[in-house]
């Protein structure tokens, strides 16, 4: 399948109560790993302080139906909000 480098699909995943949701989120990201080109995880944490919320940014590739499926499954996890969009030049 040819890839149009002028079109990118990006998903943002906001996770509240990371320790509670992390296992299920990781399971889904592993399940859909073939559709994730880039993954960046961000949270506030240093030393003794570690934030309960986190942000995951994904660059998705290939099957758009799988992107929607992943988004829907992530949104079904309590404390998780996911949205994706296409960016075009």
Describe each PLM feature range:
Residues 1-89:
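Long, contiguous binding/interaction regions
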